[in-house]
Amino acid sequence: MIKRLKIKNFKSYRDSEFEFGKVNIVVGPNGSGKTNLVDAFSFLKQLIRPLSYPPYPFIRWGDYKNVVFMQDENLDISFEIDGEYKGKDYHYEISLNKLQIKKEIINFDSYSMERRGNVIRYENKEMTIPDNLSVFNLFFAQPFITAYNLNFTLPPELLNFMTNFLNDVGVFRIVPQIAVSPVYFTFPEALDENGRGLVKVITNNLSRINETKQVYDFLVENNISLRPVFTEDGNIRLHFIEKSENNKELILLPASVPDGFIKMLTILIAVYLLKMSTIIIDEIENSLHLKYIERLVDIMRYSDSQFIATTHSPLIIDFMDPSEIIILDKERGETKINKVQEPEKLKEKLTGNGILLSEWLLY
């Protein structure tokens, strides 16, 4: 679980600090910085575990100028995260300018590791690292083995943290038809930000899906079963099977399946099958009918996953407790963060005056 995030000089965040709980709904007018918060998590994950080499974490935005505050390339971007991993506290800091990582600090339980410039220090040991690589680039997991490129050994507990940090944090901008698009059979068993990879996850976990109550119940309620199909060119396609009253099977291709159903299925699999500890979603309400939104609120409240979600939907806001709302606004190009002060008093006031939380936020 992520408890705190501090952002300096990333996009519209000059010097901003978030405190997170179990459910966090981020609201604000267009252009206030909601998507920039999602981008911050996306950028950080790409920074510490690049998808390609040499690493270039700015590729989505073009270059460093387009991600640094006020496009001032003299400024360093930095992040600080406090959270909990397997019941133990951690603290992580990173600062960079362009492709040069200047500092990293990692504290996990009683262990500490520090990187200044290209030198990593742990206890009385040290080694050098290229300027453009995070310390976390040195750790990777293969089936049945964990490997790392250090010239000294680490305790198993710290090694586990270093290998898995942020791997169980999902950042999503789910595009339903991309989520269920065919993938090559060697595609990783993982979901990208658009949900792509869902077909591979389903293919590799069909039996587990039938044993995962929340996912199985959702499929049964919608009279749908899932059937992966391997094609001659090495791709995997997903067919959705619907049964008629006379038990005849109707094969539905993804284009014939509602986007809201696919989005809910993706979220359910991320929460209950992949067991992601934190799920970050931009515009969580998109494509979802009221029935699905109500179900999603229950998932946010009662699952083991933490949720950080942006929304424009009054309906989602009105399902929330005032303490779960994070309010953004922008002043002279800088995002400002506010939370409801004295949420219990506000709840009493809203109830007494017959005002919805979304109405209070709007007016």
Language model: regions and residue ranges:
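Glycine-centered tight beta-turn/hairpin loop motif at sheet-sheet or coil-to-beta transitions
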Residues: 13, 84-89, 221-223, 233, ...
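Phosphate-binding glycine-rich loops of NTP-binding sites
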Residues: 20-62, 264-265, 270, 310
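Conserved P-loop NTP-binding catalytic core
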Residues: 38-101
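Electropositive, glycine-dotted interaction segments
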Residues: 88-224
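Conserved ABC ATPase signature
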Residues: 227-291, 295
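N-terminal pre-Walker A segment at the start of P-loop NTPase domains
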Residues: 1-13
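C-terminal lobe/lid and adjacent interdomain/linker elements of RecA-like ASCE P-loop ATPase modules
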Residues: 220, 294-363
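Catalytic acidic motif of RecA-like/P-loop NTPases
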Residues: 11, 24, 42, 258, ...
